[in-house]
């Protein structure tokens, strides 16, 4: 598994993501602040999020510039 740091500005949420859990963003942001970014986002080769929308939103809320990602083929 190859983990790369990717700029948040280059990552795109999946438009039809069925989960709408914005209430979890604050807690995930607190966890990232305390423990660091432990689980990378999974994105496709076009940098669209496959898994990790809440982590993406939490990272944005923390002002992070890039996040660890696994690029799925």
Describe the predicted segments one by one.
Residues 1-73:
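Short, charged/polar connector segments at secondary-structure boundaries
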């Amino acid at each position: 598994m190859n983990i790369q740091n990717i700029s948040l500005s280059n990552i795109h949420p999946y438009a039809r993501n069925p989960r709408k859990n914005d209430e979890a963003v604050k807690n995930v942001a607190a966890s990232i602040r305390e423990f660091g970014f432990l689980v990378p986002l999974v994105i496709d080769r076009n940098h669209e999020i496959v898994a990790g929308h809440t982590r993406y939103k939490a990272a944005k809320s923390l002002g992070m510039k890039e996040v660890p990602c696994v690029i799925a083929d």
